[in-house]
Amino acid sequence: MALDFSNATVKAWRRENGRVGVRNHVLILPVDDISNAACEAVANNVKGTLAIPHAYGRLQFGEDLELHFRTIIGTGANPNVAAVVVIGIEPEWTQVIVDGIAKTGKPVTGFSIEQKGDFETIRQAGWKAKEYVHWASELQKEDCPISDLWISTKCGESDTTTGLSSCPTVGNMYDKLLPQGIYGCFGETSEITGAEHICEKRAANPETARKFKEIWQAYSDDVIFAHQTDDLSDSQPTKGNILGGLTTIEEKALGNLEKIGRTSTYIDAMGPAETPSKGPGLYFMDSSSAAAECVTLMAAGGYVIHTFPTGQGNVVGNPIVPVIKISGNPRTLRTMSEHIDVDVTGVLTREMTIDQAGDALIEMIIRTANGRMTAAEALGHREFSMTKLYRSA
């Protein structure tokens, strides 16, 4: 019999805009790649802060620049972040990031290196970071309904066990928690190839179906038809997928869609790093299938917990969002157990039902929201990877 989570609560931080965060980070956030060193210096000096270095932010333009801003602003705005120190080389773009994060109501201050240099920027930013750490450390958790959580998903290192156990486990979780009012998110546009017609039918309404089809068709036009091939050179499926028994992208796509459950429909199709705007429910996000990129985009969209089914074992984490790993592969549980949070191997040995596996995942989500570190957090995996649409000027 399935457990009843209808009255479940978590201990979490209620932010200024009403959202709920399950972590309490003070970020030192670079606007651009050449501000990484200053951010890391501040984080090294002030205990309790976290720098997120990245590779981009200079000479970008058009939609690529918009996505860059959206990702950086969304990362700082995520409810798992209590306060933000922003550092950029130039004041104008730094202020764009500060203004975007400030809309949440959380404390945020920006510093530009230009005409000050590293030493003075690090000194000023360090004082502000210390002030924020003192403030954030006194914030108190409160009881919040589980419906306040925003939970995203993406799978990685998939094999034949993924579509049979760990992906349906996530789908079962969504079928149980979405009716309670959570926000959910799935994506991986390339990994829906071959099952796009099925995904289109799972849309809640014709407008959402149309938006999804446009997103998928744009990917198809840009990649498959532009290069006149459906051979993605061992990228989709990967060598690991093939060794694990998934020989075609269609097989992989069918397993991918198991993550959205049996009864759930998605209410909107969003661009990368966009924030849901149509209320509680399941959303599709146009995103890369690369693990670090996808989790980064969904975290920037505001999701506070990420569920990650894996067959052969994936080690990815994220700086601000706990990533919960689920696996049903007995060999992976023997060889990579340090990376797995939820063991659903019993599904394949018929010692556990999908319903029981879904309950186990929900229990782990609650424990994680209450403060349990995920395997990725405990092992220091903080992968942050920006999605770039085209080359810089």
Curated annotation (Swiss-Prot):
Source domain of life: Bacteria
GO biological process entries: D-galacturonate catabolic process
Pfam hit, one: GD_AH_C
Subunit structure: (2R)-sulfolactate sulfo-lyase is composed of a SuyA and a SuyB subunit.
Recorded GO MF terms: sulfolactate sulfo-lyase activity
Propeptide stretches in the record: 1-2
This protein's UniProt keywords: Cytoplasm, Lyase
Function: Together with SuyA, desulfonates sulfolactate to pyruvate and sulfite.
Main location: cytoplasm
Family, similarity comment: Belongs to the UxaA family.
Record EC number: 4.4.1.24
InterPro entries, per the entry: GD_AH_C, GD_AH_second, UxaA_altronate/galactarate_dh
Lyase among keywords: yes
Source species of the chain: Paracoccus pantotrophus
GO annotation, cellular component aspect: cytoplasm
Catalytic activity: (2R)-3-sulfolactate = sulfite + pyruvate + H(+)
Disulfide bonds: none
Location relative to the cell: Cytoplasm
Protein's name according to its UniProt entry: (2R)-sulfolactate sulfo-lyase subunit beta
